[in-house]
Amino acid sequence: MPYTEKITWQGRSLTLTRDEPPTKVVEARSDEVRLETLDITDAAVRPSNLDAAEGTPLPVFQAPGVRVDVSKRKTAPMGFWHRNMEHDELIFCNKGGMIWETELGTVTLRAGQMLLIPQGVAHRAVPPEGGGENILIELKMAPMARRVFP
């Protein structure tokens, strides 16, 4: 049975057909390259915004032009408005919900939904009535993100 591998870079692609899957390797060694997992539900992943109005999300991964933060705000609205002048912010609600007040309007996110806040737009997060556990992934990325599906 042939295996197909599609390689993509800078808008180009190359399709390879192999006799064996690319996961069938004799050995893979590196001190720098590895798969990493992070359980964002772990209590040890504790951003300062969990129970503090002035708290902020916890940065967990970073590369040039992108940063991934975990937010678990549950008791108090942000005590300040934030205007990110460097990045667009893509907010993914993994668990619970969050109200986002922005100068472009107010959006309520529920688990499974995402919100793109463009660079330079003032915003703040407000937990919904009743609080509860909220887990959000915030992706800070180079500005001018555009939606490509539907």
Task: Label each residue range with its predicted role.
Residues R83-W100:
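Short, conserved beta-strand element in jelly-roll/cupin
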Residues M1-R67, S71, F80:
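A short, N-terminal "cap"/entry segment at the start of jelly-roll beta-barrel domains
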